Amino acid sequence: MFQKILIANRGEIAVRIIRACRELGITSVAVYSTADKDALHTQLADEAICIGKAAPADSYLNMERILSAAIASKAEAIHPGFGFLSENAKFAQMCEQCHIVFIGPSAEVIRRMGNKQEARNTMINAKVPVVPGTKEAVYTADYGLKLAEQIGFPVMIKAASGGGGKGMRISHSREDFTENFEVAQTESVNGFADDTMYIEKYIEDPRHIEFQILADKYGNVISLGERDCSIQRRHQKMVEESPSAALDDKLRAQMGEVAVRAAKAANYESAGTIEFLLDKNKKFYFMEMNTRIQVEHPVTEMVTGLDLIKEQIFIAAGEKLQWKQKDIHITGHAIECRLNAENPAKNFMPCPGKIDYLHLPGGNGVRIDSAIYTGYTIPPNYDSMIAKIIVYGKDRQTAIDKMRSALGEVNIDGITTNLDYQYDIITHPVFQSGNITTSFIENYFE
């Protein structure tokens, strides 16, 4: 087992990893930017090293500085969290070259699964159902239009290297195709330095269902059930829950088996997520694989009793999975709401600033993952998510009631958040019915 782990991240996920290290008796090393000198993760870690200025390029995205900090602190492994360098194949490779363990899959797997077209082809070869679409890269709108007409409108235009909802546009007809293609491609170039696009059939009003998997270095892979992430705004998840109201035991088992097959086809190790679209006829299609821990991993932890961060550490240290598929039982229901420092009334504009007063909820079955405190100033340089409120109940309605109560207890002064917006989602009759799709926000809130 590792003696010392460096956490190449910030915010609530850095705090989450530090806590797991502490429970395992592993020394934790935080890295931080000048904007984060008072951040909670720097205070909780055993050691903290400043790696640069506030801009992510000068700190949390600066591979050389992070690796220098790891070498200087004699850390044996780096946990990348999510975002930043977590799905950067070059960084994983650099860790390997420096004889530091990257807590995640290999650089080659990150590269292959990060390229959406290669990931699709890998799944097609493994007989995993995929959304009908192009098999080759598309670089021009003219060529893309020809392929779109063959597939049939509406289509989804996607960046091959995309993620987080960037580089994606829906085209409903040949008339709007060129404009949407060019916008998506520009986003891809700006966000990922890659102009490679691909086109697939747009599945209307699907559910977004993802399966959590764990895989060790010895070919053992298990599924930890699904998360329903259908409540999204512009492809950004807002509310996540497990299990999904849409799946019965038979479909859950079938999708879980396909998720395991997909992970094996990718030669995957560590915690990972296979994302599917589920259409109105209960047909499911592979969408992408996330080669990192997810923001929404706590809902899976609540219904399985596993600690996914610890499992990642065990796997990276070369240990065999201590669980078999028959050991995994989904009990009860968990829901997560993301609390963001943003103003829904002003097109969700980020609202950084000082927290003058903070009270977060508690009680039986309520978990808070956050890095904020009274007096803390949220810097303007990073993602607007400041906390995750997670609840657990014996069934979905109990969990909804608990979330309604928890959100009602939150008191945060000094900054604007999406708290009321999340409350409105949770109490909406359509959400309560469980009959939700990825169009929920668009249909009822915009």
What are these regions (language model features)?
Residues M1-N125, V138-K146:
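ATP-binding N-terminal substructure of ATP-dependent carboxylate-amine bond-forming enzymes
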Residues V29, H79, V101-I103, V131, ...:
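Structural detector of well-ordered beta-strand residues that form the stable sheet scaffold
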Residues T122-V131, G152-P154:
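A polyampholytic, Gly/Pro-enriched intrinsically disordered region
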Residues K146-M156:
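Acidic/histidine-enriched active-site and ligand-binding environments that engage anionic O-linkages
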